[in-house]
Amino acid sequence: MAVLWRLSAVCGALGGRALLLRTPVVRPAHISAFLQDRPIPEWCGVQHIHLSPSHHSGSKAASLHWTSERVVSVLLLGLLPAAYLNPCSAMDYSLAAALTLHGHWGLGQVVTDYVHGDALQKAAKAGLLALSALTFAGLCYFNYHDVGICKAVAMLWKL
């Protein structure tokens, strides 16, 4: 929770100095122990200002989603060199799944940030879901009926 300290115009130099000594970054350890139990003088005009209210949801869905996005990103960092060193169908399908999921989550954040209005946002998310499903199906079709993602990239590099 962000807390700011505001010093009103009523305080003089002593009030400003006392505020600096109360800041954990500035005060030495021996002063810190001395000031722990002393109350803040109300006449000095020091106030707590709470910038953001604490909204805690009961589910861990957002945290798990954020963690899984980072896991897929790190997985891609290892999967790309592994696919170059060992091109096989397992790598092709793993790349198809990871790239599609990574793109879906990334474009989903773009839709969330830049598409406004409930109906328009629902339509954009439905379109994104359809696009992601078609992308995954197309990559799986390409892996099964053609050379696969790894060999296709290698053929492009030979050009």
Curated annotation (Swiss-Prot):
Component of complex II composed of four subunits: the flavoprotein (FP) SDHA, iron-sulfur protein (IP) SDHB, and a cytochrome b560 composed of SDHC and SDHD. Gene3D superfamilies: Fumarate reductase/succinate dehydrogenase, transmembrane subunit (1.20.1300.10). The chain crosses the membrane at residues 64-85, 91-111, 123-144. Residues 1-56 form a transit peptide. Changing G12S: Probable risk factor for pheochromocytoma, paraganglioma, intestinal carcinoid tumor and breast, renal and uterus carcinoma; increased manganese superoxide dismutase expression and increased reactive oxygen species; results in 1.9-fold increase in both AKT and MAPK expression. GO terms for biological process: cellular response to hypoxia; mitochondrial electron transport, succinate to ubiquinone; proton motive force-driven mitochondrial ATP synthesis; regulation of catecholamine secretion; tricarboxylic acid cycle. It is a multi-pass membrane protein. This is Succinate dehydrogenase [ubiquinone] cytochrome b small subunit, mitochondrial. GO terms for molecular function: electron transfer activity; heme binding; metal ion binding; succinate dehydrogenase (quinone) activity; ubiquinone binding. Belongs to the CybS family. PANTHER family: SUCCINATE DEHYDROGENASE, SUCCINATE DEHYDROGENASE [UBIQUINONE] CYTOCHROME B SMALL SUBUNIT, MITOCHONDRIAL. One of its GO terms (cellular component) is mitochondrial envelope. It is found in: Mitochondrion inner membrane. Changing H145N: Found in an individual with features of Cowden syndrome; uncertain significance; increased manganese superoxide dismutase expression and normal reactive oxygen species; no change in AKT expression but a 1.2-fold increase of MAPK expression. A ubiquinone binds at Y114. Pathway: Carbohydrate metabolism; tricarboxylic acid cycle. It is linked to Pheochromocytoma/paraganglioma syndrome 1: A form of pheochromocytoma/paraganglioma syndrome, a tumor predisposition syndrome characterized by the development of neuroendocrine tumors, usually in adulthood. Pheochromocytomas are catecholamine-producing tumors that arise from chromaffin cells in the adrenal medulla. Paragangliomas develop from sympathetic paraganglia in the thorax, abdomen, and pelvis, as well as from parasympathetic paraganglia in the head and neck. PPGL1 inheritance is autosomal dominant. Paraganglioma and gastric stromal sarcoma: Gastrointestinal stromal tumors may be sporadic or inherited in an autosomal dominant manner, alone or as a component of a syndrome associated with other tumors, such as in the context of neurofibromatosis type 1 (NF1). Patients have both gastrointestinal stromal tumors and paragangliomas. Susceptibility to the tumors was inherited in an apparently autosomal dominant manner, with incomplete penetrance. Coiled coil: none annotated. It holds the Pfam family CybS. The keyword Heme applies.
